[in-house]
Amino acid sequence: MVAISLSFVLPPPPPRYTVPVAYAAGAANGMAVPVVETNNILSHPEGGCPLQVGEGTYELKDDLHLATPPPHPSEAPIINPNPLATVPTPPTSGVKVSLVCVSPRSKTPSFISKQIVTAPPFGDGNPALVPAPVKDGLKRRKPKNNIIKSSSSFVSRVITHEAATKRLSERSPEGLFAFANINRAFQWLDLSSKQKEEPLAKILFTKAHMLCHDINEVTKSPSHIDMVMGSSAGDIIWYEPISQKYARINKNGVVSNSPVTHIKWIPGSENLFMASHANGQLVVYDKEKEDALFTPEIQDQSAEALKASSRQPLQVLKSVNSRNQKTNPVALWKLANQRISHFAFSPDQRHLAVVLEDGSLRVMDYLKEEVLDIFRSYYGGLICVCWSPDGKYIVTGGQDDLLTIWSFPERKIVARCQGHNSWVSAVAFDPWQCDERTYRFGSVGDDCRLLLWDFSVGMLHRPKVHQASARQRTSMVAGSSQYGNRHRADSAGNRMRSDSQRTANTYESCDQAVRHPVEPRARTALLPPIMSKVVGTDPICWLGFQEDCIMTSSLEGHIRTWDRPREGINDKYNDQSSSPAVSASAAGSGSVSGLAESTMGSL
């Protein structure tokens, strides 16, 4: 009987996928996996996988399948046939894509162009962070090392296209560049080229996998692109693809020896970027500073002080206001002992939304190095997060197969979105289909599905059974939002002494984060998708919206592109007076819910 009861306690083994997961483990069914590198494959499916929505049909334009590189010869395969074994495998993230247009687009979403940023730069007021004057005027600094001629053991080899210079000189500056990782390879692609399957450059790393990457929108130009990428080893690469120069940051984990889970340039900054690590740390780096062995700047090392600081939602191990800014890190914060899954900067360039594997969403004022609010998932960890273009809403996705919409001004949950059958891996807003009243966002997940969602506040209704108690609870949360919005009393002068000088009593008094209880599902509005579609046979890892298309990438390297409906339909849809989505929201939730239900029913 004991054996029978244990069989119900043990969780089922995780799903096993043929190429990437077996590649990470080095074996499948106890046998070494023969992975042979091939060229990228570009296909144009005819009439396959259209996306039907109110404004028209999104047609699948092409499917670019990235080649999976073979393991490095020095990488011994780990034979592990037991699916329940606890031996850790190298972290993987699937294929993530960074897109950049080096020339300003002719059109920008009107919803985005109305936003006005008034926040000061990160680190403003600290003279130690004032950048040194540039000798060459407006000329951008580049990394020092040539990655093609590199003798580093971290980089295995670099393959460049034989006609790369010619292709770069002849291409339109309005075309899209794409940067994508697949296992230990990192590819630079020109999506505007007829030979888009032929990378301009491919970097093969020795053992580390690139898990995340980002492009600096401030410094980009036709002759310069600043990119940072984080690896499974914790090392970070600053890469300039046009000159093929690079620099290695956090070398051998000298600052943080944990895999980089997400990385983003700090909005408006030319040099500073933020990286989250699997050990629960958020680190701000300067691409032009050298590394040094990191020691927390905490003067009071007593057991009482350390115990008090560990209970805080944010431990400032090095403040951005520290005068010690000769080397990296610029700032280092500890949020938890568990993995940070993802983070996103708000459009006002002041707030930061962070999701963790412990199931928490933490909203920070990162300029003040403070956690304002802590929300919890319904079940399991949170995986992805994004802000609406106007900064009013935050959307998260996680292991509970749900998406959750949070109102940032009101500091409360707005709705839960049910439609995925597995973990939600990525979420993003479509700024070209958003206006002041209606929002469009999309999500992808391990169920191989792409879902699109429309919502407005007027179309969301709580369940009638709990409306009375819900109204009472809303007033309570609204009161707490005023508490969450309050201004802190500490001045810039006091903070210049560094948060690391706080004592135990100071830690007890400064924990001002509002911890919101979990809202029961029975009291929460439920939003169905307007479109749900299985778009492949392997989990989807990334989702991006462009002016003329929707793009996804998958675990096994498929980058798919859907063209938006033709211009006439889109122009009509973007007109607020004739928008089907706005009309539906004005009419109430019935028509929108009915549309979503009929869409789901036909799948």
From Swiss-Prot:
Transmembrane segments: none annotated. Residues 470-484 have a biased composition (Polar residues). Residues 577-603 have a biased composition (Low complexity). It holds the Pfam family WD40. Component of the regulatory network controlling carbon source utilization through ubiquitination and deubiquitination involving creA, creB, creC, creD and acrB. Required to prevent the proteolysis of the CreB deubiquitinating enzyme in the absence of carbon catabolite repression. CreB deubiquitinating enzyme stabilized in a complex with the CreC leads to the expression of genes such as those in the proline and quinate pathways. Interacts with creB. Belongs to the WD repeat creC family. This is Probable catabolite repression protein creC. It comes from Neosartorya fischeri (strain ATCC 1020 / DSM 3700 / CBS 544.65 / FGSC A1164 / JCM 1740 / NRRL 181 / WB 181). The gene is creC.
